[in-house]
Amino acid sequence: MGDHPIYVTDYRRPHNSPGDDILAAEMHEIARSGATLCDVQGDMFEPHPEQVCMGKEAIYKQMKYIESLKNAGAEVLMSSHLTKFAPAEEIIRIANEHIKRGADVVKIVSISATEEQLYENIRINGILKHEIDHPYLFLSGGAFSHLHRRIGFALGSCMCLCSVIDDEYRVKMQPELSKMKEIVKNFN
């Protein structure tokens, strides 16, 4: 893999999830094995529907966990997958929480269920560029998320999430890598 980054996730599973302590141990092993960017959920150690925990004990545990991943040689992306559309103020608040906990990269997924929400999420992407001095990935899910996922890099997001092939297992809203490369090339 040479100098290419390796971004890994180990999220809770919908059924029979092993628990956050086991997921943390798995991710730590992945970091020690050479992953360069480890995804830590924003509600690790205190599950919350919006993936942002605020309990002092859970936040302390997250900070220690993030420190251990960094000591293992990885950078940390903290992610919050919201189940609703969120206004700019809430997105900025969550981003600042991720930064306070030690994340190297902030990842927030909002919802674009309507065209108006899509336009607002695109606007928020630009606001984040000026409001936080930190690498971030802000994108959206939902019926109107496709455009946001394809142009977010041009609005300040530090990366794009893509699928390698278009098959039944891929996340449908993520663009195919070969198509995304063309978009990036034509943007420049």
Show the residue positions of the predicted features.
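Catalytic alpha/beta core domains of metabolic enzymes, predominantly
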Residues: 42-188
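Chitinase-like catalytic core of GlcNAc-active glycosidases
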Residues: 1-19, 66-81
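Glycine/small-residue-rich loop that forms an oxyanion/phosphate-binding "nest" at active or ligand-binding sites
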Residues: 5-55
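Flexible, charged surface loops at secondary-structure boundaries
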Residues: 1-2, 30-32, 99-100, 131-132
